[in-house]
Amino acid sequence: MKTELTVKLHEWEQKAQKRQLRRAEASGATVILNGKPMLNLASNNYLGLADDRRLIEAGCEAMRAYGAGAGASRLVVGNHPLYERAEAALKQWKKAEAALIFNSGYTANIGVLTALIGRDDLVFSDKLNHASLIDGIRLSKAACFRYRHHDIDQLESLLKQSPPAKRKWIVTDAVFSMDGDMAPLEELVELKRRYRAVLLVDEAHSGGVFGPNGEGLLHHFGLEKEEDVIAIGTFSKALGSFGAYVTGEPWLVDYLINSARSLIFTTALPPSVLAANEAAIHIVQAEPKRRERLHALSERFRTKLKRLGFDTGGSETPIVPVIVGPNDRAVAMSEQLQEAGIAAVAIRPPTVPEGTARIRFSITAAMTEEDIDMAVDCIALAGKRIGLIS
């Protein structure tokens, strides 16, 4: 086994696809990466809440009162009253009848998809969906048809031509994590109605960022009351904490409690995390200026990059990719940016399609206009050095 896996590691290295862990300590708009302070353009901490003192104090208070860990799964003796408080806050925020917290976005997607989708169902999935959605669909053992990214015409054609099934599912990210573009939810809802399907939306990168009170993209488009729509969200990005959730009707939550294996067979979240989650939900609603600032900074950053000639794809969110192409050039650009004090990571296949390696930048409300302008100057210089722009 050692020889075989060592050969594979060497292959990845030759293709500039080998990854490594780097020591990182993030605080506000800054990250100390391998001992060097840098402007953090690689974080999903969109609203700058990860080191907000109110989340920290809520977590510390809960840890002092209730201990460091849950000690059991939710269905045994790990369902702490703080779960009820956080889920009640979720229901109020999302205007939902019921809510259920999972340990992470990955386990939420795996758990929900495998619990609800069966072998006799058909799934229609955007080709650029997150790995957790892809894995959940695979584990469900349902037949899956992948449609080209955002290609509504192809999706409708697949729905029309598909064989009879117990249930049809359309599965999509709300905001695509490597491209920064938004799912055409209004058109997907129309197809869901027309072909009597269920729409499952992963709001990981849209929760806290879009919607009147940061509820997400479904609320942004006024689709939150639509029937046969399931929304999954996370606490680990804009909300600055950890964990994930599903919101919907009571029967859905009750069914998941009894069937979602990733919920049933894992230790519950620590009380400190649950307390921070509840605090974050209230802050997101009470401080809309964080979202306003985030969108203004994102627009400033994206506009400046486009004017310089960079390809930012279809980005319309705080996630702004610069498409580079070859893996080695993306790695070289990332290294040059880090030398200049900008933390930005090269994203390569299989995370993105072959030939589309990129630097994935993400903007946060913790940044300033000066941070944005300095970053753009550094990106321009790095882009010129690798021949990406003239």
UniProtKB/Swiss-Prot annotation:
Task: Give the modified residues of type N6-(pyridoxal phosphate)lysine.
Answer: K237
Transmembrane regions listed in the UniProt entry: none
Q: What GO molecular functions are on record for this protein?
A: 8-amino-7-oxononanoate synthase activity; pyridoxal phosphate binding
Which amino acids does the record list as binding substrate?
R19, H130, T351
Q: Please, one GO biological process term?
A: biotin biosynthetic process
| E.C. numbers | 2.3.1.47
Q: Which UniProt keywords apply?
A: Biotin biosynthesis, Pyridoxal phosphate, Transferase
Q: Where do the annotations place pyridoxal 5'-phosphate binding?
A: G105, Y106, S177, D202, E203, A204, H205, T234, F235, S236, K237
Cofactor field: pyridoxal 5'-phosphate
Which reaction is the catalytic activity of this chain? Answer: 6-carboxyhexanoyl-[ACP] + L-alanine + H(+) = (8S)-8-amino-7-oxononanoate + holo-[ACP] + CO2
Annotated InterPro entries: Aminotrans_II_pyridoxalP_BS, Aminotransferase_I/II_large, AON_synthase_class-II, AONS_Archaea/Proteobacteria, PyrdxlP-dep_Trfase, PyrdxlP-dep_Trfase_major, PyrdxlP-dep_Trfase_small
- Look up the record and name the pathway of this protein: Cofactor biosynthesis; biotin biosynthesis
Stored SUPFAM superfamilies: PLP-dependent transferases
Residue ranges annotated as coiled coil are none
Pfam families to which the protein is assigned, alphabetical: Aminotran_1_2
* Quaternary structure and partners: Homodimer.
Question: What does the protein in this record do?
Answer: Catalyzes the decarboxylative condensation of pimeloyl-[acyl-carrier protein] and L-alanine to produce 8-amino-7-oxononanoate (AON), [acyl-carrier protein], and carbon dioxide.
| Similarity-based family | Belongs to the class-II pyridoxal-phosphate-dependent aminotransferase family. BioF subfamily.
Q: What is this protein called?
A: Putative 8-amino-7-oxononanoate synthase
Q: Which organism is it from?
A: Geobacillus kaustophilus (strain HTA426)
